[in-house]
Amino acid sequence: IMLADPEKNQAYADLVLQHVEKENYDGVILDLSDNTGGDMGPMLAGLSPLLPDGTILFFQDVAGNRTDVQLAEGSLSMGGSAVQGSKTKVQSVPIAVILNERTASSAEIVALAFKTAENVKYFGTPSAGYTSGNSQLRLYDGTILQLTTASLVDASGQEYMNVPIAPDESSDNPLRAAVEWIHAQ
């Protein structure tokens, strides 16, 4: 999702929150296949009840300096549009994340954020590999130049610089594999 309107960004996060905050499910399947990215802020805010508070990933510059992306009570620091998520945390449930070769950019950031959660397993095929942090520079004529300025580092310390995220279980039918895994938990 890439919306320039803060109200629409918040509305997107709120719509996701309506479904995530329900407590009548035994597991979550987060299907990021074909999600080509956009703004990580609304996506992470909407999914914030499923993520633990704290550092969810890092941006690392060429000198090795890291800037952490923090989630605290539904608010995200250092990444995407300022959107408010939820302070409520959902009970611990198994979370299946589905990836494919079209899971890209901020959708890959969302996938990496779930490496901080417990009982998560990744299914499908490797992601697109647009795993980097970008900065925007507005030029004199209003044109925006997007520059890759950082790699991504997940909570375990693994660095991703334009490399795909590999699933834990490769599958031609990742939805079925995810459902079977959740039922087995």
Regions found by a protein language model. Give the residues of each.
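Extracytoplasmic/secreted envelope proteins and their assembly/folding machinery
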Residues: Q10-L17, M40-S48, S92-I95, A107-A111, ...
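Short, surface-exposed connector motifs at secondary-structure boundaries
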Residues: Y25-V28, V90-A96, A117-E118
